[in-house]
Swiss-Prot record:
The lineage of its organism: Eukaryota, Fungi, Dikarya, Ascomycota, Saccharomycotina. The keyword NAD does not apply. The keyword Isomerase does not apply. Residues 55-71, 319-333 have a biased composition (Basic and acidic residues). Belongs to the AIM23 family. GO terms for cellular component: mitochondrion. Keywords: Mitochondrion, Transit peptide. Residues 1-40 form a transit peptide. Its main location: mitochondrion. This is Altered inheritance of mitochondria protein 23, mitochondrial. It is found in: Mitochondrion. Coiled coil: none annotated. It comes from the Eukaryota. Residues 38-71, 314-333 are annotated as: Disordered.
Amino acid sequence: MFRRALPAARNFGSQLRTTRTFSLSGALLAETKSSKTNRFASKYKKSSSGNKNGPRHDNAPKKFRQGDTRTKTIRFNFDSGSEKAKEALKDLIKRVHGYSPNYQVQFVDPQTNKLRKMHLVELVNSTDLDKDGLLMVGPSSAQEMPLVRTIRVQDMIKEYSDRLALAKEKELLASGSVIAQRVINKRMQAEKKKSATKMLALSWSISVSDLMHQKKNEILKRVDNNEKFIIFVGEKESLYSARNSVEKEDGIASQLGTSRTKWDRMDEDELAMEMKKREMIFGKLEELLAECECKYDVSGSLDARMMLNVTPKPNVSKASEKETEVSARELKRQRMLAKSREAAKAKKKIDEEDLDSLYSIKIIE
């Protein structure tokens, strides 16, 4: 009996060891699993200890970093105007960007003549380059925006061409060009001559015929050129001195109180006749200036010398002359188009009548 039960006891012992081993392995596995879970939990706890609102999700808004760039496409449209007008406008856009990188400008509203902040792309895209242009005035400080206003497209092109010519002159001067230096000297002399005070000198002894013909034509010429000028009236001996002192400050004004007329040698009749003639000369001058619609200031006196500082009325005819010419050309073009349309309609009608007649002939046949 005892011997037979021995194998069974041995088997029971091996099973017992197996069970203990299995239980121990399971405990180790459970402990290992628990420790891994706790390790990740503690790691997560450490990483999220400063976040009171919980973990950050992928759909949460990200902070804008300094290295990131956000760009907005700005499109300027050039649907009208000549190539020169487009070049001038593109140059203006480039210069505005130099002062204002975001293209914000102060625009002079032509309707109200007030400033309002605008984006340059709005102005450019709403400008008809066939008739209008833009002019920019640079700001006086970095805090200000450039000033932009509407002008005629011809003036914009001229301003652009003048700046290109000036830049070319500076480039030639920097390279030591002698020709450029001569051109600049000639232009400076012409500008000095143009800015010089224009004077028309008359003598008290001038005849009414010469005054109303020769001198009148000279006055009308200056008025047509819209030039400010001075009319000096005195004795023949004083005209040379007046011409030389016209550019000096108060040069002519200092001579108005003096006279070389020999009043003390005249009798009453001669004195009355001389004063009457001077009154007539001065009256004719006033009539002539009133006819030209000029403004003038009078200095001096009839018994000495007189000066009339003349300012012509602004001449708008020359400013509108080109516009009138363009309007006339446009009207002529419209008439030609209308005639061509009428001719085309007439030809079409004749062709239709010919076709109808041919068709009727075929039917009769």
